[in-house]
A protein has these predicted regions:
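Transmembrane beta-strand segments that form the barrel wall of outer-membrane beta-barrel proteins
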Residues: 45-47, 137-151, 176-178, 211, ...
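Solvent-exposed loop/turn segments connecting transmembrane beta-strands
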Residues: 151-158, 183-187, 203-205, 227-238, ...
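Residues that define the transmembrane beta-barrel architecture of outer-membrane proteins
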Residues: 35, 64-70, 120-124, 158-162, ...
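C-terminal structural cap/anchor segments
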Residues: 301-393, 397
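Repeated loop/turn-to-beta-strand initiation elements of outer-membrane beta-barrel proteins
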Residues: 81-85, 134-138, 173-177, 185, ...
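Outer membrane beta-barrel
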Residues: 74-105, 114-193, 215-217, 221, ...
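Beta-barrel outer-membrane channel/assembly domains of diderm bacteria
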Residues: 20-140, 332, 390-397, 405-440
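Outer-membrane beta-barrel translocator/channel fold
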Residues: 95, 174-199, 246-325, 417-422
Length: 440
């Protein structure tokens, strides 16, 4: 049994009796299994257009998909008693509206063996949950949000993970999360698989474990500490410190990753950090950020949003080996100008200094190419790139379609050959309408 699982086991042993003791002293009132339940159906209409200005890895110059999705989420309440029981469930249906054989591959829809977008796909899942005092234990398929493992929601369907999650608030100003996950459902898949994939890793056994805490979440000064372990691949540690005060937000993030066990991705010794400062004055927000990757391999992660560094943005993560990047961002809330619900954002990130030629030979970031008889690093020496994002989002404030949102996003990314990324112009149009049925 590895060290992180021992830590996780000790957490459960310690947490369970303390929670039971607290509950026996003053059990939380429960609304009931059905009385505390809620149901929501999110309608998501998604158009994604990729215009490649240089040859893409797939050989396509242009990909485009338009699809309609329906995401149903049910959350039950808990039964009464010292230990309450409940269930959460979710379902998804995605339907193709427009695409073709030459235009598939945006990630909105699955692709069949002939390279065509499938007409539709669906999935479902759920989790059993137990609550005692201020601690909840869930087992099954769910979304996860932590800095070391975070399922993304960037396309038509959210990502899901299957496993065990403990969520505890027994101590004031401390939100503890611990988990063990063994399967993952990608954004364009109907079923979960027992593999976790990143930039240079693919592990099919054991899964991922983590434990950590968010500290002083509702106070001006807060932070977080987490540790995770990807089976036979790496151990990763994360720390955060942030300050919110009078229109100023300062945020610092740090990751350290070392290879572990069988080291299936090769040797890894990587430290990544970012520093961001935001100033808000009325309707205007101004942000500057700096990010640095120290190590011969990229900063890698599994789970689509498991990177809380400041310069991980719409298209690129700016996480190449030895890469340094900076960001300038501007936000405008047009509610102050008579259009409540309308927000605008633009940002620019520039990264350079990438050198992937020192990645360990034979590892996931510098594999051996049998056809050429040479090692081929993912990135060369002198890599550089930049990205510019423009977002416009409007949320209806009243009327029959209240809470419906329309988002228009445009992304431009340019890179040299050593960076290895695409020269791409990308357009997103996303329309969402949540139907909330409240509590039963």
């Amino acid at each position: 049994m590895n060290e992180l699982r021992v830590t996780f086991g000790l957490f459960l042993v310690i947490c369970a009796p303390s929670a039971t003791a607290l509950a026996s002293q003053a059990a939380q009132p429960s609304e009931g299994l059905l009385e505390g339940s809620s149901l929501e159906v999110l309608s998501r209409n998604f158009y994604l257009n990729n215009d490649y200005r240089s040859p893409s890895p797939s050989g396509k110059n242009y990909t485009r998909e338009w699809a309609q999705g329906f995401i149903t989420s049910f959350e039950s309440g808990f039964t009464s008693g010292t230990v309450g029981f409940g269930i959460d469930a979710h379902g998804f249906l995605g339907v193709k509206l427009d695409s073709g054989k030459g235009h598939s591959g945006t990630g909105l829809l699955p692709v069949d063996q002939e390279g065509r977008s499938e007409d539709d796909y669906s999935s479902g899942g759920g989790a059993l949950k137990l609550r005692t005092s201020r601690t909840t234990l869930a087992f099954g398929e769910m979304t996860v949000q932590t800095p070391v493992f975070d399922t993304a929601d960037k396309r038509l369907q959210p990502e899901y993970a299957t496993g065990l999650l403990v969520d505890s608030r027994e101590i004031d100003d401390m939100h503890v999360l611990a988990g063990h996950f063994t399967a993952f459902k990608n954004q364009d898949a109907s079923t979960s698989k027992g593999n976790f994939t990143g930039y240079g890793v693919s592990t099919r056994t054991g899964g991922i474990d983590f434990i950590g805490a968010n500290l002083f979440e509702e106070r001006p000064v807060g932070g977080a500490l987490y540790a995770s372990q990807l089976s036979d691949t790496w151990r990763q540690y994360y720390g955060n410190v942030h300050l919110k005060q009078s229109g100023v937000f300062l945020d610092g993030n740090l990751y350290h990753t070392r290879d572990y066990g069988e080291s299936v991705a090769g040797a890894i010794d990587n430290t990544a950090y970012s520093l961001a400062a935001q100033y808000t004055a009325g309707a205007h927000g101004f942000t500057l950020a700096f990010q640095k990757i120290n190590g011969d391999t990229p900063f890698d992660f599994v789970g689509g949003d498991s990177i809380y560094l400041a310069n991980s943005i719409k298209y690129a993560d700016f996480n190449g080996p030895r890469e340094r990047s900076w960001q300038a961002r501007y936000d405008l809330d047009l509610g102050s100008y008579g259009v409540p619900g309308l927000k605008f954002m633009t940002r620019y990130v520039n990264g350079r200094g990438i050198d992937g030629t020192h990645a360990p030979q034979g590892g996931g970031y510098n594999p051996f190419d049998e056809s050429s008889g040479e090692y081929v690093p993912q990135q060369g020496d002198g890599g550089r790139h930049w990205e510019r994002d423009i977002d416009l989002r409007y949320v209806l404030q009243s009327g029959p379609a209240k809470d419906m949102s329309v988002q228009l996003s445009h992304v431009v990314h340019r890179a040299n050959s050593a960076q290895g990324g695409d020269d791409i112009d990308r357009l997103y149009i996303v329309i969402e309408y949540p139907l909330k049925f409240g509590r039963f």
